[in-house]
C-alpha cells in the first residue's frame, strides 16, 4: 500500500466512524438534524429560500456501510443549498469586458481546481450582472465545485474575494450550520466525488450528475463534537503521512 492508498484508507475509516472513539455523552446527530430542519423551515417562511420537492426516504439497501450509534444518514439535499452556474448562452466571451469600477468578476473552474480566487480575468458589466446573473453571485464562505472534466474539486471562498459570479462549469454549495465544513469536504472527497464520477453523464467529458441525482446522494452525519474530533485526527495523520512521503522521496534521491 502506497502513501496515497493509505490516505484514502484513513478517509474511509474516518467517515465510517472507525478512526476516533465514540462518546455516549455527545449530543446525537438526530438532534442536530432537527435543528437544521427548523432552520430550513424558517428560511422558507421568510422567503429566503424556496420549498423544494421532498426527497425520498432512505432505504436500508442504499446505505453503503453501517454507521455508529448516534450517527444519522441524510441526503445531500437535506443539509445544504446547491446552485449550478448559468446556462452556457448566459455567459459567453462576447459578453466579457475589461476590468473596471463597473464590472463583476466571472469565476471559472480553475479557481476551484487550483484553489485560488485571484485567477482569471473575465468580467461582465454590473448592468448585465443585475439583469441576468445576480442569482449566481458567490460570497465569502461559499463552496465552489468544478462540474465538468475535472469534477468535484472544491474551494471555500475566503474573506476579501472580488465580487463575482460562477460560470456554467461551476456549482456553489452552502452547508447548514451544524455540519462542519471540513468534515463535509472530507466526506465529499472520499465518497461523493467518486460517486459523482461514476454516475456522471458522458464518456469523453465527465459532468456532475443532474441535481435530482446529486441531491439524493447519501451523507453520514456524526454528532457535531465527533465531527471535530474526526477532522482533527485526520489532519494529524495526513500531516504525518505528508512528512513520511517527503522523507521517502529524499531517501530515493540520495
Predicted feature locations:
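Structural signal for hydrophobic
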Residues: 71, 154, 216-217, 227
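Short, ligand-facing micro-motifs at secondary-structure edges
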Residues: 88-91, 112-124, 143-166, 181-186, ...
Amino acid at each position: 500500500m502506497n502513501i496515497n492508498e493509505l490516505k484514502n484508507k484513513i478517509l474511509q475509516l474516518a467517515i465510517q466512524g472507525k478512526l476516533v472513539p465514540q462518546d455516549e455523552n455527545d449530543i446525537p446527530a438526530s438532534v442536530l438534524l432537527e435543528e437544521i430542519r427548523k432552520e430550513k423551515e424558517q428560511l422558507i417562511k421568510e422567503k429566503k429560500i424556496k420549498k423544494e420537492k421532498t426527497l425520498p426516504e432512505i432505504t436500508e439497501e442504499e446505505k453503503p456501510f453501517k454507521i455508529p450509534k448516534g450517527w444519522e444518514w441524510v441526503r445531500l439535499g437535506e443539509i445544504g443549498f446547491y446552485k449550478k452556474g448559468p446556462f452556457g448562452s448566459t455567459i459567453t466571451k462576447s459578453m466579457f469586458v475589461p476590468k473596471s469600477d463597473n464590472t463583476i468578476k466571472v469565476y471559472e473552474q480553475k479557481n476551484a481546481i487550483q484553489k485560488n480566487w485571484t485567477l482569471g480575468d473575465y468580467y461582465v458589466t454590473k448592468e448585465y450582472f443585475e439583469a441576468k446573473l445576480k442569482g449566481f453571485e458567490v460570497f465569502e464562505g461559499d463552496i465552489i465545485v468544478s462540474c465538468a472534466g475535472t469534477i468535484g474539486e472544491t474551494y471555500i471562498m475566503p474573506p476579501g474575494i472580488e465580487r463575482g459570479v460562477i460560470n456554467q462549469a461551476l456549482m456553489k454549495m452552502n452547508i447548514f450550520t451544524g455540519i462542519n465544513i471540513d468534515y463535509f469536504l472530507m466526506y465529499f472527497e472520499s465518497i461523493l466525488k467518486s460517486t459523482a464520477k461514476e454516475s456522471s453523464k458522458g464518456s469523453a467529458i465527465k459532468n456532475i450528475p443532474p441535481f435530482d441525482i446529486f441531491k439524493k446522494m447519501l451523507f453520514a452525519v456524526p454528532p457535531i463534537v465527533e465531527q471535530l474530533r474526526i477532522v482533527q485526527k485526520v489532519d494529524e495523520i495526513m500531516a504525518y503521512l505528508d512528512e513520511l512521503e517527503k522523507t521517502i522521496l529524499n531517501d530515493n534521491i540520495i
